[in-house]
Swiss-Prot record:
It comes from the Viruses. Probable terminase small subunit. The terminase lies at a unique vertex of the procapsid and is composed of two subunits, a small terminase subunit and a large terminase subunit. Both terminase subunits heterooligomerize and are docked on the portal protein to form the packaging machine. Once the capsid is packaged with the DNA, the terminase complex is substituted by the connector proteins gp15. This is Terminase small subunit. Belongs to the skunalikevirus terminase small subunit family. It holds the Pfam family Phage_term_sma. Keywords: Viral genome packaging, Viral release from host cell.
Length: 174
């Protein structure tokens, strides 16, 4: 470690060299945040920011890999909640001597998670699953239903249902 002018030794020069450089990048790719990294290196946040700013391209690439890994994990978790799954619970009862007395196995079938389904649908088509848009569509639907009811009510008054009376022309009226 090198000493700075009038201060304690710094690890910054070693951070630019192998193998420490690769180790830092690996930690970033694995999803560690900056604080976890500079704390494990026993350096200050300012020192780490200086290294990060000098190596911004490698840092950004590692962060994008970490985000991709996190997104994959989230997608697989969501996919598992979008399928019907069976959960097994095993309950073992022991006697006073520690011997197995009874084993109960319960199976629960967990249905698809509707909130997850809505979230995935919203991610696919945000305009359609926007709560404001959803309310507007419901109002349009209800007003269309009201309009349909009014039209059906007016159908009762169609002139075709009534017979026109035959009017005789009075004598001398032509």
């Amino acid at each position: 470690m090198q000493t700075q002018k009038g201060g304690r030794p710094t690890i910054l020069p070693k951070m630019y060299e192998e193998p420490l450089f690769s180790q830092i990048i690996d930690k970033i790719e694995s999803g560690c945040n900056d604080r976890e990294i500079y704390t494990s290196l026993h350096c200050s946040a300012k020192t780490f920011r200086k290294w990060r700013d000098d190596n911004i391209k490698a840092y950004d690439e590692a962060k994008s890999i970490a985000r991709g890994n996190l997104l994959e994990l989230a997608e697989s978790a969501l996919a598992s909640k979008l399928t019907v799954r069976t959960l097994k619970e095993t309950e073992t009862i022991y006697d006073a001597d520690g011997n197995v007395e009874k084993v109960k196995v319960k199976e629960k079938e967990l249905d698809k998670d509707s909130l997850v389904a809505m979230m995935v649908a919203k991610a696919g088509n945000p305009e359609l699953y926007n709560p404001t848009e959803w309310r507007r569509l419901q109002q349009e639907e209800s007003s269309a239903h009201d309009l349909k009811a009014k039209i059906e009510e007016l159908d009762d008054y169609k002139l075709s249902k009534y017979k026109t009376p035959e009017i005789e022309v009075p004598e001398g009226f032509e």
